[in-house]
C-alpha cells in the first residue's frame, strides 16, 4: 500500500522518501523507565542521583524512598493502569514522587503547584480521575475541592526506617505499553488535552543515542523547565534512566546561573537560552533546545562552544522525534527522525510531496503516543493508521509545516495555524521571523499579524528596526516584511519558557494606541517602531495576569547592615519570616559590584605557589626528595645490602605512622598554635598551617614503598646468589609489597574520592595485615643477618629499627585501648540533621574532632566535637551526606562506639589571630561552633545553608547568634548560591580581619582559600588527604 502512495513521485524522490524519513533501527535496552533507573541504582548505589544545591540524594536512598512510596500508594489502591496527579514543585520530592508512582505501576500527571492555574488543575483532576493526588502540604488549599479523591502528602511520607525489608518494591506488572505519564497541553486554543504517553514511547527516546545525549553516571544534568512541560521529562527521566545526576535549579536568576555553571548537559527553550553567553558556562558540554523555533544567532553562538542539538516534536510524538547536531554557519534545521521513528511530509490528501516541497509533517514509529485521554473523536482526527508502515501502527498529524533539505534534514516552516493572509498572499509567520534574524545583531525574532498589520518583534532593544527591515526585504517579498516593529531587551516567556505571544500582542496594541494619539501620528506608509526596555514587559504582562497561586514566603535568617562588637547584647531574631524582615537591607547587598583587590603575583607564580605547590605538597616533596637523594647516594656508593635497605623502609614507615598518631598530632598542634597573636603575621600564617602535616605522612608512605621495592629487588638478588637473605624473607616481602601497592593505589586522590569506602577498608585491613607481616619479615631478616656470637634477643635490643617497629606498632594499637561503647542522647533537628550528645567524662577542647562508629571493625567516621563552655561532655552534628549518616538521622542511635582521644583539626588555629572571618557552609557550622561559642577572639561568622532553622534547629542557631550577634546567615534557598570569594572579601574588609578559615566541601574550600591567599590574605581550610 505504501508504494502505491508514492507512485506520483520520481524514482529519486521515492528513494529519498524512505532514506530521509526512516530513523535508524535500534535496540532499546529497557522497556520501562523505572526498570532503567533500578538498573543504575543497583550498579551505582552511592552515586548522587538528585542534587539541589547542598542537598544530595544517592541512587540507593532515592530507590529506597521510591519503593516505600510505591508500597504506600499500592495500599491506596494504585496499581497498573491507575493515574496519580502529582502536584509538587521543583524539589527532590518531585523525583521521589515520579519514581514512586511508576514503581506502583501507575502514570503520573505532573503539575507545579506554584504555576498551574486553578482552571487547568481542576479540569485535569476531573478529566483524568486520579486514584490519588500526591502533593505537598503547602499545596493543600489547591486541592480542597477534590474531596472525593484520596490526598497523600508527599512531604509527610518520608520513610524513616533503615530496615531494608521495610522498603521493598511492590510486585511489578508494568510493561512497555502501560502509561508512564499524562501531559496536559497548554490549551491556548481551547481546553487542555491530556496526552497519554507510554513507557515504550519514553525509553525509545531516552535510553538510546542520540536521545540519551551522553547522559551516564558522573554526568550532571540540569532541571530547569516547568515540570508540566513534556520537555522536562527529558531532563528528569532522562537523567534517572541513564544513571546521571539531576541538578535542580532554584527560583532566582542567581540560582539558575549557579546550576548552569555546575552541569554538563543543559535543556532549554531558545527563549530561555538567549540572554546567556556560552563563554560564562565553560562547564557545559551539551545543550539541547526545543519547544519553539531556534534563532540562527543562538544556534551559531552556542554551537561554536558545545554540542548544540535543535530538537522538535509535539507531546503527542513523545518529547521530540527529530534532532539535529548544529554546525555553526549551517542552516538551522530540526534534523531527521530519531531511531525507530519516522517522519513524512505530506500534502492535504496525505500523499508525500516531492523532496524540497513544503507539506505537513506526520510522525510515525515508536514515539507515537496512545492518544488523548477521554477524547476518542479528537484522537481519531489526529492519529490515523500509518499506511507507509503497513504494520498496524499509527501516525500523528503534528500540524507543523516542513520540507526536506537536500542534506536529509527537515526545515521547520511553522504551524499550519501560523499561516496568515496579507494582501491576498499566504504568509508563514515563522518564515518572516527567520528573515528578520538574518540582520546582524538580532538574537531572536518573531512575527504576528495584529489588526491586519504585520508586526515584527526582535531582541535586543538596541537594534535599529530599519536595519531589520532592510535585511528582511532581501529574503522575503514586500508583503511578507513587517511594517511595524518592537525591539525589546528580551521576550516575555510563558511558564514553559516559550515566547509569550499573548503579551507581545498586548504590547503592540498598547504601542499602537500611543502612536494614534494626535501628537504622535506618523505617516501610514512608513514603518513604525518602538524600543521597549525589559521593565515594560512586566507591565504588559501585568495587564492580564495569569492565575498563579500565592507562594508562601520562606524562612531565613539575615544580618542587616551595621557592626556590633562580639559579646554585646544579643539580637532577637525571630524564627519566622515577617514583612519587616523582607524590607531589611542585607549585609551582602551589592557585594557583586565590589571591586576586589588585585592578586599579588603573576598567574603562573601564584598558581605554582598556592595550587600546585601548596604547603601540603611542599612537605610531601621535602620528605620524598630527601629520600630520593639518599637513594641516589646509596646507588652511587653501592654501600648497601638488604638489611640496610630494610632499616630505611622501617624509618619511613615510622615517620608516616607517627604523623597520623593522635597524641603526636595533638602535641604538634599545641606547639605550633601556641604562637601568640603579637608575633608577626608572616610567622603566624606559616605556623597555622600545621594541619598540612599530612604531607609528611604521604611523603613518608610513598618513600617507604619506593625503598621497599629497592629492598625487594636486593633481597631477591641475594637469595638467588645464595647470599644472606632467605627464601622465607623474600616471600613475605612480596606479600607486603603487594599489600602496600594496594593501599597506595586506593589512596590516590581521584580514586579515593570515587571509592572512599574501598579506600578506608584497604587502608584498614591491608594495613593491619601488613603490620603483622612486617613483624614476621623483620624477625626473619634479623635472623638472616644475625652476627656470629649473638643471640636473637641481644641483636634486637641493640637494633634501633626494632624499637622503631615497637613504637609505631604501639601507636597504631593505642587508640584501640581506648575503645568503648558509650551512651548518646539524640536531638533530631530535621530530616536532614541530628545532634548527638555525649557525656562519658570527656570534654574536648575547641577545634577537635572525634571518631564514631556503630561497627568498629568496619568503619569509623570523624565529626567535629561541639563543647559548651561551662558544661561537661560534647555534641556532634550529623547531617545527611550518605548511607551511614542517613541511617542515623532516620533512626537516631542511643549508643555509639568511640576510640582514641579528641584530635585537633584546622580550627585549633583560631586563637593565633586578632580578628578573623569564619566561614561555614551547611553542616560545616559544626566544626566552627566551638570556636564561636568560646568567643576566643573577635570574629565575623558567615554561614550559608538552605532553610537554616528548619534544618539545624533553633537551639544551635540561637547559640551561634548569641555568641556572635553579627553572624551573617545567608539562606541559599532564598537568595541563591553566592559568589563566596567576593562575599568573604567584603567581610574581611569590613571587619578588618587578619585571616579567614573555612569549613565546607573540597571545591569551595579550595576556591575560597585560593581567592584569599592569592590576594595576600591568610586563609585556611581542611585538607582532604584521609
Swiss-Prot record:
Contains three distinct domains: an adenylation (A) domain that activates the substrate amino acid which is subsequently covalently linked as a thioester (aminoacyl-S-PCP) to the 4'-phosphopantetheine prosthetic group of the second domain, the peptidyl carrier protein (PCP) domain, as well as a reductase (R) domain of the ferredoxin-NADP reductase (FNR) type. InterPro entries: AA_adenyl_dom, Adenylate-forming_domain, AMP-bd_C_sf, AMP-binding_CS, AMP-dep_synth/lig_dom, ANL_N_sf. Residues 682-901 are annotated as: Reductase (R) domain. Adenylate-forming reductase, a natural product biosynthesis enzyme that resembles non-ribosomal peptide synthetases, yet serves to modify one substrate, rather than to condense two or more building blocks. The A-domain preferentially accepts L-serine, L-alanine and L-valine as substrates. The natural product of the enzyme is not yet known. Residues 556-638 are annotated as: Thiolation and peptide carrier (T) domain. It is an enzyme of class 1 (oxidoreductase). It comes from the Eukaryota. It holds the Pfam family AMP-binding. This is Adenylate-forming reductase 06235. Belongs to the adenylate-forming reductase family. GO terms for molecular function: ATP binding; oxidoreductase activity. It comes from Coprinopsis cinerea (strain Okayama-7 / 130 / ATCC MYA-4618 / FGSC 9003) (Inky cap fungus). SUPFAM superfamilies: Acetyl-CoA synthetase-like (SSF56801). AMP binds at residues 332-333, 412-415. NADP(+) binds at residues 685-688, 769-771, 840. Keywords: ATP-binding, NADP, Nucleotide-binding, Oxidoreductase. Residues 37-422 are annotated as: Adenylation (A) domain. Its EC number is 1.2.1.-.
Amino acid at each position: 500500500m505504501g508504494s502505491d502512495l508514492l507512485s506520483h513521485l520520481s524514482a529519486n524522490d521515492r528513494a529519498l522518501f524512505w532514506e530521509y524519513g526512516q530513523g535508524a533501527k535500534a535496540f532499546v535496552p529497557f522497556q520501562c523507565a523505572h526498570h532503567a533507573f533500578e538498573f543504575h541504582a543497583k550498579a551505582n548505589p552511592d552515586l548522587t542521583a538528585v542534587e539541589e544545591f547542598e542537598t544530595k540524594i544517592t541512587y540507593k536512598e532515592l530507590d529506597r524512598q521510591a519503593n516505600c512510596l510505591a508500597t504506600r500508594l499500592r495500599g491506596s489502591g494504585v496499581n497498573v493502569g491507575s493515574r496519580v496527579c502529582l502536584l509538587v514543585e521543583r524539589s527532590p520530592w518531585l523525583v521521589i514522587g515520579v519514581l514512586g508512582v511508576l514503581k506502583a505501576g501507575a502514570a503520573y500527571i505532573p503539575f507545579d503547584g506554584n504555576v498551574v492555574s486553578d482552571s487547568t488543575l481542576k479540569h485535569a483532576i476531573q478529566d483524568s480521575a486520579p486514584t490519588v493526588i500526591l502533593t505537598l502540604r503547602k499545596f493543600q488549599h489547591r486541592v480542597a475541592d477534590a474531596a472525593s479523591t484520596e490526598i497523600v502528602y508527599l512531604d509527610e511520607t518520608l520513610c524513616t526506617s533503615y530496615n531494608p525489608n521495610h522498603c521493598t518494591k511492590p510486585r511489578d506488572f508494568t510493561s512497555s505499553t502501560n502509561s508512564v505519564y499524562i501531559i496536559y497541553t497548554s490549551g491556548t486554543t481551547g481546553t487542555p488535552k491530556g496526552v497519554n504517553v507510554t513507557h515504550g514511547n519514553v525509553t525509545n527516546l531516552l535510553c538510546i543515542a542520540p536521545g540519551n545525549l551522553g547522559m551516564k553516571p558522573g554526568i550532571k544534568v540540569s532541571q530547569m523547565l516547568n515540570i508540566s512541560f513534556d520537555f522536562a521529562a527529558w531532563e528528569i527521566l532522562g537523567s534517572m534512566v541513564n544513571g546521571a545526576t539531576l541538578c535542580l535549579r532554584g527560583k532566582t536568576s542567581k540560582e539558575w546561573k549557579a546550576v548552569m555553571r555546575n552541569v554538563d548537559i543543559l535543556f532549554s527553550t531558545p527563549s530561555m537560552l538567549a540572554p546567556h553567553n556560552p563563554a560564562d558556562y565553560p562547564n557545559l558540554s551539551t545543550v539541547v533546545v526545543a519547544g519553539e523555533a531556534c534563532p540562527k544567532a543562538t544556534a551559531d553562538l552556542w554551537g561554536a562552544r558545545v554540542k548544540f542539538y535543535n530538537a522538535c516534536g509535539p507531546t503527542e510524538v513523545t518529547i521530540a522525534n527529530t534532532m539535529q547536531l548544529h554546525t555553526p554557519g549551517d542552516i538551522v534545521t530540526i534534523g531527521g527522525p530519531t531511531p525507530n521513528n519516522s517522519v513524512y511530509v505530506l500534502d492535504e490528501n496525505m500523499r508525500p510531496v516531492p523532496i524540497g516541497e513544503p507539506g505537513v509533517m506526520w510522525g510515525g514509529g515508536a514515539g507515537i503516543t496512545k492518544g488523548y485521554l477521554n477524547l476518542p473523536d479528537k484522537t481519531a482526527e489526529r492519529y490515523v493508521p500509518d499506511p507507509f508502515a503497513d504494520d498496524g501502527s499509527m501516525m500523528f498529524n503534528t500540524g507543523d509545516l516542513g520540507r526536506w533539505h537536500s542534506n536529509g534534514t527537515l526545515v521547520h516552516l511553522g504551524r499550519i495555524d501560523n499561516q496568515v493572509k496579507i494582501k491576498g498572499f499566504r504568509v508563514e509567520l515563522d518564515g518572516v521571523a527567520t528573515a528578520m534574524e538574518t540582520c546582524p545583531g538580532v538574537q531572536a525574532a518573531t512575527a504576528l499579524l495584529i489588526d491586519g498589520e504585520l508586526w515584527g518583534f526582535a531582541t535586543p532593544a538596541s537594534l535599529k528596526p530599519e536595519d531589520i527591515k532592510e535585511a528582511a526585504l532581501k529574503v522575503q517579498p514586500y508583503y511578507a516584511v513587517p511594517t511595524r516593529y518592537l525591539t525589546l531587551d528580551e521576550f516575555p516567556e510563558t511558564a514553559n519558557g516559550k515566547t509569550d505571544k499573548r503579551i507581545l500582542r498586548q504590547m503592540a496594541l498598547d504601542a499602537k494606541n500611543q502612536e494614534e494619539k494626535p501628537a504622535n501620528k506618523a505617516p501610514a506608509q512608513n514603518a513604525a517602531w518602538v524600543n521597549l526596555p525589559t521593565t515594560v514587559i512586566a507591565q504588559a504582562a501585568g495587564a492580564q495576569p495569569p492565575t498563579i497561586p500565592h507562594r508562601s514566603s520562606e524562612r531565613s535568617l539575615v544580618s542587616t547592615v551595621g557592626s556590633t562588637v562580639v559579646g554585646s547584647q544579643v539580637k532577637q531574631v525571630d524564627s519566622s519570616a515577617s514583612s519587616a524582615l523582607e524590607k531589611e537591607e542585607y549585609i551582602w547587598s551589592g557585594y557583586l559590584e565590589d571591586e576586589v583587590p588585585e592578586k599579588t603575583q603573576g598567574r603562573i607564580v601564584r598558581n605554582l605557589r598556592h595550587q600546585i605547590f601548596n604547603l601540603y605538597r611542599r612537605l610531601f616533596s621535602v620528605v620524598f626528595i630527601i629520600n630520593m637523594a639518599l637513594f641516589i647516594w646509596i646507588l652511587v656508593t653501592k654501600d648497601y645490602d638488604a638489611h640496610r635497605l630494610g632499616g630505611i623502609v622501617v624509618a619511613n614507615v615510622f615517620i608516616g605512622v607517627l604523623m597520623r598518631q593522635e597524641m603526636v598530632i595533638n602535641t604538634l598542634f599545641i606547639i605550633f598554635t601556641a604562637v601568640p597573636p603579637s608575633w608577626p603575621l608572616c610567622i603566624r600564617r606559616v605556623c597555622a598551617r600545621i594541619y598540612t602535616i599530612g604531607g609528611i605522612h604521604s611523603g613518608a608512605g610513598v618513600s617507604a614503598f619506593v625503598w621497599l621495592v629497592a629492598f625487594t629487588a636486593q633481597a631477591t638478588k641475594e637469595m638467588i646468589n645464595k647470599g644472606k637473605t632467605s627464601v622465607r624473607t623474600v616471600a613475605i616481602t612480596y606479600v607486603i609489597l603487594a599489600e602496600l601497592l594496594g593501599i597506595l593505589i586506593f589512596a590516590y586522590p581521584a580514586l579515593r574520592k570515587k571509592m572512599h569506602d574501598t579506600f578506608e577498608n584497604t587502608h584498614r585491613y591491608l594495613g593491619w595485615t601488613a603490620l603483622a607481616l612486617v613483624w614476621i619479615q623483620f624477625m626473619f631478616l634479623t635472623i638472616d643477618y644475625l652476627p656470629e656470637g649473638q643471640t636473637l634477643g641481644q641483636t634486637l635490643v641493640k637494633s634501633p629499627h626494632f624499637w622503631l617497629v615497637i613504637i609505631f606498632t604501639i601507636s597504631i594499637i593505642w587508640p584501640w585501648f581506648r575503645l568503648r561503647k558509650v551512651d548518646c542522647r539524640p536531638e533530631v533537628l530535621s530530616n536532614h540533621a541530628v545532634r548527638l550528645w555525649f557525656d562519658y567524662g570527656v570534654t574536648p577542647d575547641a577545634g577537635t574532632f572525634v571518631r564514631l562508629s556503630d561497627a568498629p571493625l568496619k568503619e569509623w567516621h570523624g565529626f567535629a566535637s561541639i563543647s559548651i563552655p561551662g558544661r561537661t561532655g560534647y555534641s556532634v552534628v550529623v547531617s545527611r551526606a550518605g548511607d551511614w549518616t542517613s541511617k542515623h538521622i532516620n533512626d537516631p542511635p542511643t549508643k555509639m562506639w568511640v576510640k582514641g582521644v579528641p584530635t585537633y583539626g584546622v580550627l585549633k588555629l583560631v586563637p593565633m589571630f586578632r580578628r578573623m572571618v569564619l566561614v561555614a557552609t551547611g553542616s560545616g557550622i559544626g566544626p566552627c561552633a566551638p570556636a564561636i561559642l568560646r568567643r576566643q577572639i573577635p570574629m565575623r561568622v558567615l554561614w550559608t545553608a538552605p532553610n537554616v532553622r528548619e534544618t539545624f534547629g533553633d537551639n544551635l542557631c540561637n547559640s551561634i547568634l548569641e555568641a556572635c550577634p553579627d553572624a551573617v546567615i545567608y539562606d541559599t534557598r532564598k537568595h541563591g548560591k553566592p559568589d563566596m570569594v567576593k562575599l568573604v572579601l567584603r567581610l574581611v574588609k569590613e571587619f578588618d580581619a587578619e585571616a579567614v578559615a573555612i569549613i565546607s566541601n573540597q571545591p569551595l574550600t579550595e576556591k575560597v582559600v585560593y581567592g584569599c591567599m592569592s590576594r595576600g590574605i591568610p586563609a585556611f581550610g581542611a585538607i582532604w588527604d584521609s
